[in-house]
Regions:
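Hydrophobic/aromatic residues within well-ordered alpha-helical segments
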Residues: 68, 75, 79, 83, ...
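Amphipathic alpha-helical segments used for helix-helix packing
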Residues: 107-140, 180-185
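Helix-turn-helix
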Residues: 25-28, 32, 36-70, 74
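C-terminal peripheral helix-coil segments that are non-catalytic and often amphipathic
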Residues: 1-13, 141-153, 175-216
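Short Lys/Arg-rich basic patches
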Residues: 15-19
Length: 216
């Protein structure tokens, strides 16, 4: 009678699993799911694929997130928090030019973040909407306070004007990250860094002219 024993590699993996803290397990699951989404889109949100990619059991995902929907909501919160951190950092310096701040905002949506937010919205339409709205509200509050502080005495800066500026920039940055290259090509423009910079400079000039008119 033969006795089958684990190889050292299998034993090591089991020990590592047992030693993984709940926070480490959640982080591993989220990172694996995020990686699968980046490579396959929403189709990557199959729990069995995530479990296989993370080297864990399907039941462990359910233990930490309750369901696929719970995992999607956690992924959405993670993406929203990442976007908020980047946008707040983009506005951290009040001395930065409009051009530099626009570059930072546009870059905040790059590296697949806009795609992740869009894809997650397709599988959980209510999961991230509120969080994203609150991000923009926070950014609008910061910008409005800055515009009021910079305005000459007696100038009135309507809050809805600031809200519209935030909406314009966020929509442009989000859309550019998703379809910017395709839209450039469809307009007969080269999908290059120079084209991106040209549009951002044009948008900065538009915002500056509008702000000068409002504050004057």
């Amino acid at each position: 009678m033969s006795i089958v024993t684990d190889t050292p590699e299998v034993s090591t993996r089991r020990v590592k699993r047992l030693r993984r803290t709940p926070e480490e397990a959640r982080r591993l699951i989220l990172e694996t799911a995020q990686s699968l989404i980046a490579s396959t889109g929403p189709e990557g949100l199959r729990l069995q694929d995530i479990a296989a990619g993370a080297g864990i059991s399907h039941s462990l995902i359910l233990h930490h997130f309750g369901s696929r929907e719970g995992l999607v909501r956690a992924l959405t919160r993670q993406a929203v928090a990442e976007l908020r951190d980047k946008l707040v950092a983009a506005m951290a310096s009040g001395e930065a030019s409009v051009e530099l701040q626009l570059d930072r905002v546009f870059d905040a949506f790059r590296d697949g973040l806009a795609q992740r937010l869009a894809w997650l919205a397709t599988v959980d339409s209510r999961g991230g909407a509120e969080g994203t709205q609150m991000i923009l509200r926070d950014i609008a509050d910061r910008l409005h306070a800055r515009r009021i502080a910079a305005a000459p005495p007696g100038a009135v800066i309507p809050r809805d004007d600031t809200d519209s500026l935030i909406h314009l920039v966020a929509t442009a940055a989000f859309g550019d990250a998703l379809f910017g290259a395709q839209l450039h090509r469809s307009a007969g423009l080269p999908a290059t860094i120079e084209t991106d910079r040209g549009f951002r400079r044009w948008l900065a000039a538009l915002i500056r002219a509008h702000s000068t008119q409002k504050e004057g």
